[in-house]
Amino acid sequence: MRPALGHPRSVSSASGSFPPPPAAARLQPLFLRGGSFRGRRGSGDSSTSTSTSRGGGGGRRGGGGGSPSSSTGAEREDDDESLSVSKPLVPNAALLGPPAQVGAPAGPAPVAFSSSAATSSSTSTPTSSCSMTAADFGGGAAAGAVGGPGSRSAGGAGGTGTGSGASCCPCCCCCGCPDRPGRRGRRRGCAPSPRCRWGYQALSVVLLLAQGGLLDLYLIAVTDLYWCSWIATDLVVVVGWAIFFAKNSRGRRGGAASGAHNHHLHHHHAAPPLHLPAPSAATAGAKARGARGGAGGAGGGLGAAAAAGEFAFAYLAWLIYSIAFTPKVVLILGTSILDLIELRAPFGTTGFRLTMALSVPLLYSLVRAISEAGAPPGSAGPLLLQPQRHRAAGCFLGTCLDLLDSFTLVELMLEGRVPLPAHLRYLLIAVYFLTLASPVLWLYELNAAAAAAASWGQASGPGSCSRLLRLLGGCLVDVPLLALRCLLVVSYQQPLSIFMLKNLFFLGCRGLEALEGCWDRGNRASPSRARGGYGAPPSAPPPPPPPPQGGSQLGHCISENEGGAHGYVNTLAVASQN
């Protein structure tokens, strides 16, 4: 390699106050150094010409003058600028190894590529953690992608060679979260931040205790019923919900830890070299894609399993609550306890209505407690939610409307405006508790959909089981509510309600979903319709494009002289300086 030009006196004067320029920095191309060529003249590690000009500067500081030396250094600097374009980026000794080392294992490949730069780089330190020389670029790429088996570990962890495949980006490409540096400058990866989501869980327990305690107060204060059974029922419900929250949080923590481990395998990898011939580059890219796909497949399966555990046992929690809540309210509404509440209770029937209405915020707290804890940091707002959480939000809104509809029917009994017979009163109570228990169906649907997505390892979509559950929920809730509304309008001269339009709209939507499911089963072979199904297996990846004709990847745009092992890097350096 051509030695650096410079006056002996100026170099010796600079050696006392500044370290010698590293030899690896002279091999570094412009696009890897960062900044413009003109702006890096005085940095001390950019090129040979800057070391010469620094020597002149040292002479000026040492002797107070030094103008002839500085002018001579400037002239030599301009000469070196013109020569650095045609200067090879890697010594010629490094070019002898690649033809025989392409099919070799990952161990000797970095040694062959970095043999000439080992002695010079031992006395110099890199200026940045993200900078790399051309020898490191060639050696690390060859060790990471062409090394055969074990190349991923050699490139990712550094191995024994000079180049390493570790990424130096400050953020995580998988989740978008900023990477948090650990102690002593080590990187922690994209482990999820321990955001505390115990607020909604605590609110759920408080609402359970408040509603159960008020109903117990009504049953115990105004009657002679035995009070231990009601309090024991409330304690059983609270303990069941606490166990559910504990299992849900434990499953989510396990899924987050496995996802963080698989992110390290997915994110920190070495890219295939850009200067290899076309067949070798295609083989290296296929190996890299295969290794990445294996790690990503495992991570995707674990992530889907964690998503499947997100709504697990939620339907059991709401079912336990519905079973414990129903006897108390039925006992109050079906007997004379309601009249005693109006006479003896502090707030009368208004307090009882508010106690019954606590079911809606309780359902909201349950949905938020199991969905917000697994949400990514940037998923604020309904349009940025995952499909399962989007579906849960829509089902919650529909359940709120159904509960409001059924509660207005129950108020006819509380106010006594319409003299309803006993069988119609019990029918109204039955419809109300069917509506109250309807979230069990869509919570189970979300759990089954997540389990199906975890088994196939892909995103969830509407399947036949979920459409059947939606249609069943519509038949159990909307049909009885609409029938009762029509009966009250015809037989008891009640005015038309806007909830009748709501019932018709929901029934029409669920009927269309059922018809769409039947149509999808008939056209399951269509790729556009099979893309969004639950049970459709993942499609095969498209075949790789055919390799270009010629001896190298850029054989159609560069000459044969530049088509060697490092011709691609030289071409980019010339283009960036022009």
Curated annotation (Swiss-Prot):
Extent of Low complexity compositional bias: 8-17, 44-53
Modified residues (Phosphoserine): S167, S552
Region Disordered, residue ranges: 1-84, 106-129, 529-557
Highest taxon in the source lineage: Eukaryota
Keywords: Phosphoprotein
One Pfam family from the record: CECR6_TMEM121
Keyword hit for NAD: no
Tissues in which the protein is found: Widely expressed, especially in adult heart, brain, prostate, testes, peripherical blood leukocytes and fetal brain.
Residue ranges with Pro residues bias: 538-549
Keyword DNA repair: no
Composition-biased stretches (Gly residues): 54-67
Classification via PANTHER family: TRANSMEMBRANE PROTEIN 121B
Family from the record: Belongs to the TMEM121 family.
Additional facts recorded: Candidate gene for the Cat Eye Syndrome (CES), a developmental disorder associated with the duplication of a 2 Mb region of 22q11.2. Duplication usually takes in the form of a surpernumerary bisatellited isodicentric chromosome, resulting in four copies of the region (represents an inv dup(22)(q11)). CES is characterized clinically by the combination of coloboma of the iris and anal atresia with fistula, downslanting palpebral fissures, preauricular tags and/or pits, frequent occurrence of heart and renal malformations, and normal or near-normal mental development.
Name used for this protein in its record: Transmembrane protein 121B
Natural source organism: Homo sapiens (Human)
